[in-house]
From Swiss-Prot:
GO terms for cellular component: cytosol. One of its GO terms (molecular function) is nuclease activity. This is Putative pre-16S rRNA nuclease. The keyword Cytoplasm applies. GO terms for biological process: rRNA 5'-end processing. It comes from Shewanella denitrificans (strain OS217 / ATCC BAA-1090 / DSM 15013).
Length: 141
C-alpha cells in the first residue's frame, strides 16, 4: 500500500447505495451520503461527481454474502456494480466482505443518537465506512 491512499467505499443496495471516504494513513473513514438507486441502478452522474471530487486511488465495494460465506442474489449485482465503476471511471476497484456491516452500523448510530439516528441513509453511509475500515484492517493483518 502506498503512503496515503484516498479510498471511496460503497455499500451497494437495490434502493440505496451508501458512500464513505477514507484515508489509508489514518485507516479511518467518514460517511458521505446515500445515493438513491432504482432496482440497483444508481444515477451514474452522481457517482461520477463523487469520483471527480474525491479522486480516489481505490474504490471498495461491499460484497454481501450469507453468514456461511455463500453468495446471495444481490452478490452478483454488487460485483457488476463494482465492475461498472472500474470500467466507466478507470479506477482500481476491490470488493470487501460486508457481512454484519449493517448490524454494526445500526449499533454505532444507536450509540450516538438513539432510534432517531437510524435513518436508512445514515445506516447505509456508516455501512460504507465499516466496509472501508474492514478493508484497512485486512491490509495490516
Amino acid at each position: 500500500m502506498t503512503m496515503n491512499q484516498t479510498v471511496l467505499g460503497f455499500d451497494y443496495g437495490t434502493k440505496s447505495i451508501g458512500v464513505a471516504v477514507g484515508q489509508s494513513i489514518t485507516a479511518s473513514a467518514s460517511p458521505l451520503l446515500a445515493l438513491k438507486a432504482q432496482d440497483g441502478i444508481p444515477n451514474w452522474d452522481e457517482i461520477e461527481k463523487l469520483i471527480k471530487e474525491w479522486q480516489p486511488d481505490l474504490v471498495v465495494v461491499g460484497l454481501p454474502l450469507n453468514m456461511d460465506g455463500t453468495e446471495q442474489d444481490i452478490t452478483q449485482r454488487a460485483k457488476k456494480f463494482a465492475n461498472r465503476i472500474s470500467g466507466r471511471f478507470g479506477v482500481k476497484v476491490l470488493t470487501q466482505d460486508e457481512r454484519l456491516t449493517t448490524a454494526d452500523a445500526k449499533a454505532r448510530l444507536f450509540e450516538l443518537g438513539g432510534y432517531k439516528a437510524l435513518t436508512k441513509g445514515q445506516v447505509d453511509a456508516v455501512s460504507a465506512v465499516l466496509i472501508i475500515e474492514s478493508y484497512f484492517e485486512n491490509q495490516y493483518d
